[in-house]
From Swiss-Prot:
InterPro entries: RNA_methyltr_RlmE, RNA_MeTrfase_FtsJ_dom, rRNA-MeTfrase_E, SAM-dependent_MTases_sf. Gene3D superfamilies: Vaccinia Virus protein VP39. Signal peptide: none annotated. This is Ribosomal RNA large subunit methyltransferase E. The keyword Zinc does not apply. It comes from Borrelia garinii subsp. bavariensis (strain ATCC BAA-2496 / DSM 23469 / PBi). Belongs to the class I-like SAM-binding methyltransferase superfamily. RNA methyltransferase RlmE family. GO terms for cellular component: cytoplasm. The keyword Magnesium does not apply. GO terms for molecular function: rRNA (uridine-2'-O-)-methyltransferase activity. S-adenosyl-L-methionine binds at residues 48, 50, 67, 85, 107. It catalyses: uridine(2552) in 23S rRNA + S-adenosyl-L-methionine = 2'-O-methyluridine(2552) in 23S rRNA + S-adenosyl-L-homocysteine + H(+). The gene is rlmE.
């Protein structure tokens, strides 16, 4: 989604990315070195900018992108797209088929209602599913990055990260819009 006047949207368009959100991932990766050898899972991949960047950073292994909506990316080698709902057993089974993963990234957000309490609750439930699914497919020492909405039960998510990862960090990248209440939680070195 490109919005005139937004520097990150204009930059994304110039550089061929599908969405401005890619600069959040780029900034986080430059600071915390998310990518290593191994498979990468992008949950909530639409419109596809996180997957575009992840594909460029892929060292060995495959990129698996999952979303309930189609994405326009079509790479020939080492790329698989799964159209499905992460709450479905069938989708989880397909994700498992390509694992394990050294990195799971998620920029997914629930459909927003405008009611912050409802939106943060929906974000929490979505992220708990992403985390549970990630714990099934992450390699020991793997990394997990998720977007969460502030103002609800997000600290429960952070505590779960602290329990299972050696390094955890709350991050608000510069590309996050000023009026947004989103932040990212990063967990590195799964399984302590």
């Amino acid at each position: 989604m490109y919005h005139l006047g937004d520097e990150y949207s204009q930059k994304a368009k110039r550089e061929g990315y599908l969405a401005r959100s890619v600069y959040k991932l780029i900034e986080i990766n430059e600071k915390f070195s998310l990518f290593s050898s191994g498979n990468v899972l992008d949950i909530g991949a639409s419109p596809g900018s996180f997957s575009q960047y992840a594909y460029k950073k892929l060292k060995r292994g495959v990129l698996v992108s999952v979303d309930i909506n189609d994405i326009s990316l079509r790479y020939v080698n080492n790329f698989y797209f799964i159209k499905g709902d992460i709450f479905s057993d069938d989708t989880a089974s397909k994700i498992n088929k390509f694992g394990p993963y050294s990195l799971v990234i998620s920029d997914v957000a629930p459909k927003t209602t405008g009611n912050r309490l409802v939106d943060t609750s929906n974000s929490f439930n979505l992220n708990m599913r992403i985390i549970d699914l990630s714990f099934e497919v992450l390699l020991k020492k793997g990394n997990l990055l998720v977007k969460v909405f502030q103002g609800g039960d997000e600290m429960q998510i952070f505590k779960k990260f602290e329990k299972y990862f050696k390094f955890v960090k709350k991050i608000r990248p510069k590309a996050v819009r000023k009026n947004s209440f989103e932040i990212y939680f990063l967990g590195k070195s799964f399984g302590k």
